[in-house]
């Protein structure tokens, strides 16, 4: 079956990076965030393995990345999809 690969480039401002004492701490944070995104995508049963500005906490940030990833693969908002009148 065809496979879709989505690569991410995470760009942050200095004040975000200053929250972490080492690059290892930053990497661990990003890894946990994308694990959360993967967990949310798995609940959609889309078979997905796998640029939003976001100033929210961890849980909201995971939701935002998962939401924007769904748009990358063509998912519309609920009110914009083919089932909007049902």
UniProtKB/Swiss-Prot annotation:
Required cofactor(s): Zn(2+)
EC number: 3.4.24.-
Tissue/organ expression: Expressed by the venom gland.
UniProt keyword Iron-sulfur present: no
Cofactor note: Binds 1 zinc ion per subunit.
An example Gene Ontology biological process: proteolysis
GO cellular component, one term: extracellular region
GO molecular function, one term: toxin activity
Keywords assigned: Calcium, Hydrolase, Metal-binding, Metalloprotease, Protease, Secreted, Toxin, Zinc
Active site residues of this protein: 68
Entry-linked InterPro entries: MetalloPept_cat_dom_sf
Location in or out of the cell: Secreted
Residues involved in Zn(2+) binding: 67, 71, 77
Keyword Secreted part of the UniProt annotation: yes
Assigned protein family: Belongs to the venom metalloproteinase (M12B) family.
Protein name listed in UniProt: Venom metalloproteinase
Species assigned in the record: Tityus serrulatus (Brazilian scorpion)
Lineage: Eukaryota, Metazoa, Ecdysozoa, Arthropoda, Chelicerata
């Amino acid at each position: 079956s065809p496979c879709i690969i989505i690569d991410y480039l995470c760009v942050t401002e200095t004040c975000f990076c200053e929250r972490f004492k080492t690059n290892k701490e930053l990497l661990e944070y990003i890894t946990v965030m994308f694990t959360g995104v993967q967990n949310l995508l798995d609940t959609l049963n889309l078979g997905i393995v796998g640029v939003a500005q976001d100033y929210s906490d961890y849980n909201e940030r995971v939701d935002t990345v998962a939401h924007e990833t769904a748009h990358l693969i063509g998912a519309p908002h609920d009110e914009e999809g083919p089932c909007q009148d049902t």
